[in-house]
Design a protein with these regions (language model features):
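Non-catalytic, C-terminal membrane-associated alpha-helical segments of glycosyltransferases
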Residues: 187-244
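Glycine-rich, basic loop-to-helix element that forms the pyrophosphate-binding segment
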Residues: 15-35
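Acidic donor-binding segment of Leloir-type glycosyltransferases
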Residues: 1-17, 27
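A short, conserved alpha-helix in the catalytic core of glycosyltransferases
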Residues: 116-118, 124-175
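Short beta-strand-to-loop acidic/aromatic patch adjacent to the donor-nucleotide binding site
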Residues: 37-48
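Conserved donor NDP-sugar-binding/catalytic core segment of glycosyltransferases
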Residues: 48-85
Length: 244
């Protein structure tokens, strides 16, 4: 990667450790802030941008409206699924997670609800795989919250924007392609535990839930982790038997 960046005239900043998506992005965002940039774009490495005026349109929209501090485009998968704009996961969907998981499997949708991608508008939340950000807003925040590792970055940022009285904006006439890279996801129990811990943190520090609602969600996530732990142990036993 370092050699490729040198060939393409890009700045490569190595991280000494993997502290998660937000912490990694903050390295680049702080660098951009130090260099005096007004805007920054955070994208996954599996994004493609066939639209030549993509950046110009997004930045132009932010220039016209100073209340917009986060902006996103239409994001489409090779299968034609739209990943923007997004709505928050509701309290009941998070609390009654078995029902929500079943709904997602049947509809093949994510737990965050996708809204109509044909209309440009202010929106509750945007996918973190490709977003434009106003640097001065990030500086006031102290940059991205680094207390989560892999999950809940989008709802945390969306709540911070809402709390600051600013806006997220979805621009429908710009489009990027997300060729999602399928990778080995590792231990499912550890991933579920990480998701539950991230949601508990998000609900405590970056939500409008009261103490009672937070306690209900914490109990629900505790049950979810316990069930996943049992399933993981059963899977390990089954794998050991099959190897004999």
């Amino acid at each position: 990667v370092k050699i490729l960046c040198q060939e393409q005239g890009c700045t490569f900043i190595a991280s000494r450790e993997n502290r998660g998506y937000n912490a990694g992005n903050n390295i680049g965002l702080r660098y951009a802030a130090e260099k005096g940039y007004e805007y920054a774009f955070v994208t996954n490495p599996d994004m493609e941008f066939p639209q030549t005026d993509y950046m110009a349109k997004l930045i132009g929209t932010m220039e016209k409206d100073p209340d917009i501090v986060v902006i996103g485009s239409d994001i489409v998968t090779p299968e034609g699924r739209h990943q923007n704009p997004l709505d928050f996961l509701s309290f009941w969907s998070e609390f009654l997670w078995p029902i929500d998981l079943l709904r997602c499997k049947l509809t093949k949708k994510t737990t965050s609800s996708s809204l109509d991608p044909t209309i440009s508008r202010y929106c509750p939340m945007l996918s973190g795989c490709c977003i434009g950000l106003r640097i001065d807003f990030l500086k006031r925040l102290g940059f991205f919250d680094e207390n989560v590792f892999l999950y809940c970055e989008e709802p945390i940022l969306a709540h911070q924007v809402k709390k600051a009285g600013k806006k997220l904006y979805y621009l429908a006439d710009t489009q990027a392609l997300h060729r999602h890279i399928k990778s080995t996801k590792g231990n499912p129990y550890k991933r579920m535990s990480l998701l539950c811990d991230s949601r508990n943190y998000k609900n405590k520090y970056h939500s409008d839930y009261n103490a009672f609602e937070q306690s209900l969600l914490t109990a629900s996530h505790k049950l979810r982790k316990w069930i996943m732990e049992i399933l993981a142990k059963q899977s390990q036993k089954s794998n050991k038997r099959s190897k004999k």
